[in-house]
Amino acid sequence: MEKAILGGGCFWCLEAAFSQLKGVERVVSGYCGGHTDSPDYRQVCSGDSGHVEVVEISYDPALIDYATLLQVFFAVHDPTTLNRQGHDVGTQYASAIFYLDETQRECARRVIAQLDAEQIFDAPIVTRVESAPRFHPAEDYHQNYYAQNQQQNYCQLVISPKLAKIRRRFSHLLQN
């Protein structure tokens, strides 16, 4: 089992998206990249801790590789807006790849360069690519949020359309 740590706006969106993929065994919402030892949601949302909302993905590289995870990552959020995803604004919503080794770093740089060269987006990608500091799991009520709260407005208006996009574009990667 390998791990990936990605931030692309609200972690509820990424958790719901990656949980649907074949080869993904576990997705944990959490915080990464800040300067406090034990961040909580309030500190992260205030911007005071410097952390980014992220997901830690545990995956089987024999079933899905890191580059494919990144393709899905770039499809489900806007990597061209600095510290913002839709109405979610602040450094905690940064687009970020926290790599765990040099292979992940090189893969991330290669995928970004390819997407920029192909002009997939209307603006350059501003995703941070940084060595992963300590990952901090978020509070329990953030885990599996979409699965437990599908009728909430945020889930219906923000997360569900992203999941529909994944079903259309990456149907071959979905769990049965």
Curated annotation (Swiss-Prot):
Its EC number is 1.8.4.11. GO terms for biological process: protein modification process. InterPro entries: Met_Sox_Rdtase_MsrA_dom (IPR002569), Met_Sox_Rdtase_MsrA_sf (IPR036509). It catalyses: L-methionyl-[protein] + [thioredoxin]-disulfide + H2O = L-methionyl-(S)-S-oxide-[protein] + [thioredoxin]-dithiol; [thioredoxin]-disulfide + L-methionine + H2O = L-methionine (S)-S-oxide + [thioredoxin]-dithiol. Keywords: Oxidoreductase. One of its GO terms (molecular function) is peptide-methionine (S)-S-oxide reductase activity. It is an enzyme of class 1 (oxidoreductase). The keyword ATP-binding does not apply. The active site is at C10. It comes from the Bacteria. PANTHER family: PEPTIDE METHIONINE SULFOXIDE REDUCTASE, PEPTIDE METHIONINE SULFOXIDE REDUCTASE MSRA 2. Has an important function as a repair enzyme for proteins that have been inactivated by oxidation. Catalyzes the reversible oxidation-reduction of methionine sulfoxide in proteins to methionine. Belongs to the MsrA Met sulfoxide reductase family. This is Peptide methionine sulfoxide reductase MsrA. The lineage of its organism: Bacteria, Pseudomonadati, Pseudomonadota, Betaproteobacteria, Neisseriales.
